[in-house]
C-alpha cells in the first residue's frame, strides 16, 4: 500500500493525527523543561526466518507515531499514579531513586577529562536530573557520546516497583506507575484490578487489607522478574548478532570505534553489531592504553585509535558460547 493510498484511506482521521502530534510535542517540551532524562541508545531490529535464524539486522527507527504513543503513555501513567496516590489506597508505583552520590562524583570526575561538567549540590553530592539532561544534549553527535551516555546510565539507580510513591528521578516527576500495558506487564494488570474494584465500588476495607498484604511482594517479585527478562533479552540479542555475523566471517565493513579498553578497541557497525579488535591483533607497533583520554596509542608510530573514529574492519571470528564477535583491522587500515 503506497503513501497516497494510506493517506486517502485515513483522510477523515488526518486532522486528529496532526492534533495528536501537536499535543505530544507540547508534552515532550513540558517534560524537558522539568528535567526529564532521555537516554536515546540505538536499538536493534533483528529479522528472523521461519527457523529463527537472523537474516537481517538494522537500527530500530523511531517515528512520529512512536513518539506520540510514548508521550501519551507517559501522561496516562503519571495521571493514574497521582490520582490513586491522593485516594490513599494500596497501589503499585514505578519509582526511580536518586543516583548514588559516589557514582555521581565518579561520573563528574570522568567527564571532566573531556571538558564536560555537571553541577553537583555542594555537601550532599546530589545532582538534579536536568544536569544529566544537559550533559546528554552537550555530547550529542560527539565522539564520546556513546561512552559517556553509557557511564551516565550506569551512575543511575535501577527503576523498580514499589508500594511507596517516592518519585521518578529519570522522568523528573513525583507520581508514576505502569498502567498502560496490562496484557504484557503484571504490575499494570494488578493496577487495573484495583481500578476496576474502585470504579465498581468494591474497594471496601476487606479488599484494601487484601491489597495491603500482597502488594509489597507483588512489587518485589515484579522487579526481580523484570531484571531477569531484561537480562534474557540482552543475551538473546547478543546471540542472534553472533549467529548473523558467523556467515560473514572474512567480510569487511566500515564502523565506528565505540569503546577503548586496555585489552582492545570495540567497533560498532551501522547495523548496531559490535565486535572487538584485541590489542594483540593491532599490528605494526606496540599499542598501549591511554586511560585519561580513552585512546589506544602506538608507542613508536604515535598512531592513535580513539572514540568516534571511523575504521574498516574484517570479521575474524565469532564465539557463540561467549556471545562475542572478533574483528581485525582491514589491510588498508593497517597500511595507513
Question: Language-model features: where?
Answer:
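Electropositive polyanion-binding surfaces
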Residues: 1-283, 293, 308, 314, ...
Amino acid at each position: 500500500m503506497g503513501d497516497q493510498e494510506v493517506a486517502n484511506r485515513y483522510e477523515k482521521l488526518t486532522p486528529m493525527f496532526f492534533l495528536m502530534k501537536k499535543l505530544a510535542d507540547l508534552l515532550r517540551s513540558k517534560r524537558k523543561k522539568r528535567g526529564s532524562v532521555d537516554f536515546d541508545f540505538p536499538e536493534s531490529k533483528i529479522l528472523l526466518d521461519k527457523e529463527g535464524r537472523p537474516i537481517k539486522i538494522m537500527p530500530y527507527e523511531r517515528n512520529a507515531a512512536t513518539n506520540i504513543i510514548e508521550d501519551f503513555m507517559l501522561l496516562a501513567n503519571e495521571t493514574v499514579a497521582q490520582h490513586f496516590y491522593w485516594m490513599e489506597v494500596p497501589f503499585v508505583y514505578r519509582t526511580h531513586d536518586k543516583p548514588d552520590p559516589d557514582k555521581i562524583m565518579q561520573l563528574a570526575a570522568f567527564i571532566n577529562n573531556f571538558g564536560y561538567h555537571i553541577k553537583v549540590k555542594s555537601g550532599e553530592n546530589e545532582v538534579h536530573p536536568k544536569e544529566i539532561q544537559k550533559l546528554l544534549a552537550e555530547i550529542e553527535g560527539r565522539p564520546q557520546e556513546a561512552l559517556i551516555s553509557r557511564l551516565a546510565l550506569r551512575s543511575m539507580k535501577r527503576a523498580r516497583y514499589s508500594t511507596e510513591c517516592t518519585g521518578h528521578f529519570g522522568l523528573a516527576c513525583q507520581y508514576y506507575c505502569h498502567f498502560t500495558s496490562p496484557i504484557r506487564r503484571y504490575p499494570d494488570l494488578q493496577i487495573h484490578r484495583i481500578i476496576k474494584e474502585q470504579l465498581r465500588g468494591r474497594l471496601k476495607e476487606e479488599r484494601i487489607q487484601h491489597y495491603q498484604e500482597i502488594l509489597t511482594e507483588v512489587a518485589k517479585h515484579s522487579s526481580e522478574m523484570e531484571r531477569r527478562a531484561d537480562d534474557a533479552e540482552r543475551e538473546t540479542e547478543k546471540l542472534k548478532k553472533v549467529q548473523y555475523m558467523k556467515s560473514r566471517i572474512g567480510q569487511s565493513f566500515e564502523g565506528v570505534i565505540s569503546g577503548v579498553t586496555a585489552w582492545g578497541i570495540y567497533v560498532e557497525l551501522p547495523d548496531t553489531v559490535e565486535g572487538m579488535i584485541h590489542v594483540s591483533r593491532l599490528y605494526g607497533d606496540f599499542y598501549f592504553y591511554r586511560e585519561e583520554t580513552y585512546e589506544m596509542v602506538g608507542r613508536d608510530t604515535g598512531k592513535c585509535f580513539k572514540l568516534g573514529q571511523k575504521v574498516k574492519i574484517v570479521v575474524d571470528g565469532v564465539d557463540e558460547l561467549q556471545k562475542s564477535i572478533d574483528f581485525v583491522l582491514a589491510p588498508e587500515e593497517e597500511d595507513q
